[in-house]
Amino acid sequence: RESERSRGLGDVYKRQAVCCNAYLDGLELGIENKIMPCETYIVCTEPLDEAIQNTILPNNYCVSDTNFDLNYYRLSSSKRMIFGGAVGYSLKNVEGLKKRTKRQLDKVYPQLVNHKIEYIWGGLIAITVNRVPDIGMLNDNIYYAHGFSGHGVAFTGIAGKIISEGIVNGKTSELEAFEKIKHKNFPGGRLFRMPLLVTISAMQRMMDVFNV
């Protein structure tokens, strides 16, 4: 965002980057209503021996499944399993999310049940209704990108490139393509949007369980 301030002796122009993502907290309702903050956690095991490594990811691939609340995982350079995916919306049940992440890991790889979790971290991410990133402009001078819906590591670099090219060259075809995506507001307003999302998400998880 470019801002202007007059001091009487001249004009000062500044370029600002405001980093909020899931933490907008009323800063800009026009785009805040298009995202929902939710919690996600990642666990990291103790180092795994080579025999175990060969039974889980012998080619050291990075994996992401197609569940509504997707699981994603890979081996670190220190041969630990890094596994994430449990999503919560209450913003309160942190311990429950940590345990659910470990249960998901054990379900995918039963051979890791007895391996210790040494590190856990997490926080808020921003999701959109259609799970597609929301990238665009406000007032012709504010570029924004958020709502990566759990794919931020991959998409934020692409979004940064799209926005930087827009700043330098003006609105590009890539930016216009994202602006054509009609992102819906989360239903329910401030009072009911969270209960509605929790209910819908529970239904989606059941569909994941039964492979519907």
Language model: regions and residue ranges:
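Conserved FAD-binding catalytic core of PHBH/FMO-like flavoproteins
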Residues: 48-81
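C-terminal catalytic lobe of FAD-dependent flavoproteins
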Residues: 83, 87, 91-93, 98-209
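Conserved hydrophobic/aromatic beta-strand scaffold that supports enzyme active sites
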Residues: 42-44, 72, 134
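Short Gly/Pro-enriched turn/cap motifs at secondary-structure boundaries
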Residues: 32-37, 61-64, 123-125
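Short, solvent-exposed loop/turn segments at the edges of secondary structure
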Residues: 38, 66-68, 130
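Single conserved hydrophobic/aromatic residue that forms the stacking wall/gate
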Residues: 1-13
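Short glycine-/acidic-enriched loop or helix-start segments at secondary-structure transitions
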Residues: 27-29, 54, 93, 154-155
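Central helical "cap/lid" subdomain
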Residues: 11-53
